Amino acid sequence: MTEQTATQNYSFQAEVAQLLHLVTHSLYSNPEIFLRELISNASDACDKLRFEGINHPEYYEDDANLRVRVSLDKENKTITISDNGIGLSQQEAIDNLGTIAKSGTKDFMSKLTGDQKSDAQLIGQFGVGFYSGFIVADKITVESRRAGLPANDGVRWISGGTGDFEVQQITKDSRGTSIILHLRDDALDYLDAWKVKQIINKYSDHISLPIEMQKEVWQEEEVAEGEEPKGGQYVKTDEWEVINSASALWTRSKNEISEEQYIEFYKNLTHDFDAPLAWSHNRVEGNTEYTQLLYIPAKASSDIFTREAKAGIKLYVKRVFIMDDADNLIPNYLRFVKGVIDSADLPLNVSRELLQESRDVKTIREGNTRRVLTLLDGLAKSEDEKDQEKFKTFYQEFGSVLKEGLGEDFTNRERILKLLRYATSNQDEISTSFADYKARMKEGQKAIYYVSADSLAAAKNSPQLELFKKKGIEVLLMSERVDEWAMNFVHEFDGTPLQNVSKGAVDLGDLQDAEEKKALEQAAEQFKPVVDKLTDALKDKTKEVRVTTRLVDSPACLVTSDGELSPQLIRMLKQAGQAVPESKPILEINPEHPLVQKLEGSAQFDDLANVIFDQAVIAEGGLPEDPAAYVKRINSLLLK
């Protein structure tokens, strides 16, 4: 590298400047991870060269042995991490090193809390491991040339980790990238070769490429002839030695891999600072042969419910990296799963379009789905306290994502149902499965009852539960946005029908005695004039008014007919910008309630009728159509 052009100065994207400050402070408690991150990036660069080299063998430039090298220079106080991978063009260096190249950057920055552990995890998830070099360096120089470009199209990128960086065009004979860290005075212990080798073996042993360092030999001090040497030192040679095992971890036998190695591979793969909850490593043989190493993270990524959420599966073919985010290999409701799939059958030039049509991919996807559900089922059924805690953590983080599978995966719907957990009218903890509920059903109970609402508190205090509480019948409480949608695809569990207590008529069968049924019939007949008058007064808001079969303490509640969308689902669809068919709820009134009894003969019948309706709307989590009119009616009634 000799010639260079004039220096051009650029400013960092505002979020990057903030991030650089954060990196040097929040991550300082675990500084050695900088080496893991930079070696991982170097390995990725070599993977990308392998992939592009399939169609462009000239990119190898007579240097086909891919590797990563770590060099220590005590005199200049630098560590250099270099690779002979794909390299960067000048524009790529400006774009990739000066911005966070990911949508949702502002959302990312808003989630930073100042807490070292949680912020470190966020930083890793957003793929900005390069900046971890500033944990130990007060200046970073990057020298690179992209494969396929001429030698004089190299680039040098320099930054002191503040608000700007400079870029120069240089001549670089070899392709690839060298990252030169100019160490701060408090980080000079990373110039110790033995320490660096330990860090490489700890974090990066599984990297499939050789990671090399200059070999050192012991050289005794020179002494006069006949005298015994009293000391010596290690000196570097021109020979490079491989520090790591240099074999892809997933290709090894499970018996040869320690738990710590599995965890470090996961952290390197995902840039997650937390250990995974569980993993499954298998070689699948048959018509379609592949190796799968799948992980369940301990924490959901910040974008899991956004359109930007990507599947965390890397696809390899015969150990050649093909693509990140291979979403065809895992169903969308398992998008939280991270890992590696290495296929023996797919072509090396496979495209995302081909993945959609491939029979082998369909087989791999089905196999991955079964394996993940089996892994989760094992945690759920385990009597080991640690496994139980892992499943509880999993469900807190990913339960709502898993529920999407009820509508997406008919084949595995029963398996998914068995993994779901809910609070109930008898217990607040979200720990009751459908099987648990069924085992606790009252004698004579014919259905599994549930109620859905916008929050756990709203579900627990739903007016529709009053009769069930009076009868001592347990009801499942569903309080997540996805619940109402998901339950549209489920009609029974293990032969027992599911019944939404806010839909249709309530029939408790043998749990409701003949006298109660007779009393309800008499009340309906007695209040028919009031019901007719209410029907007329609320004709624009309700499709029907009827005497309730489910209320005890509340004056009224809203219900929907079987097969119709609930108010919660209507609100959710509208918030998502989807068209919703017009529908009106059914208003059920409680003839035993004083407010309802006051309707008969009231001079303010219409006002009272509308207040009762609006209160029913509020009770199920909605808002009155005209809040101002509601307040006006309340005030008018209070003054009487």
From Swiss-Prot:
Region named A: 1-352
Lineage top rank: taxon: Bacteria
Listed GO MF terms: ATP binding; ATP hydrolysis activity; ATP-dependent protein folding chaperone; unfolded protein binding
Record localization: Cytoplasm
Region (C): 572-640
Cellular component annotations (GO), alphabetically ordered: cytoplasm
B: annotated span: 353-571
Spans traversing the lipid bilayer: none
Gene3D superfamilies referenced in this protein's UniProt entry, alphabetically: 3.30.230.80, 3.40.50.11260, Heat shock protein 90, C-terminal domain (1.20.120.790), Histidine kinase-like ATPase, C-terminal domain (3.30.565.10)
Pfam families named among the record's database cross-references: HATPase_c_3, HSP90
InterPro entries: HATPase_C_sf, HSP90_C, Hsp90_fam, Hsp90_N, Ribosomal_Su5_D2-typ_SF
Key words, A-Z: ATP-binding, Chaperone, Cytoplasm, Nucleotide-binding, Stress response
Main location: cytoplasm
PANTHER family reported in the protein's UniProt record: HEAT SHOCK PROTEIN 90 FAMILY MEMBER
Family that this chain belongs to: Belongs to the heat shock protein 90 family.
Quaternary organization: Homodimer.
Function statement: Molecular chaperone. Has ATPase activity.
Protein's name according to its UniProt entry: Chaperone protein HtpG
Source organism of the structure: Acinetobacter baylyi (strain ATCC 33305 / BD413 / ADP1)
Taxonomic classification: Bacteria, Pseudomonadati, Pseudomonadota, Gammaproteobacteria, Moraxellales
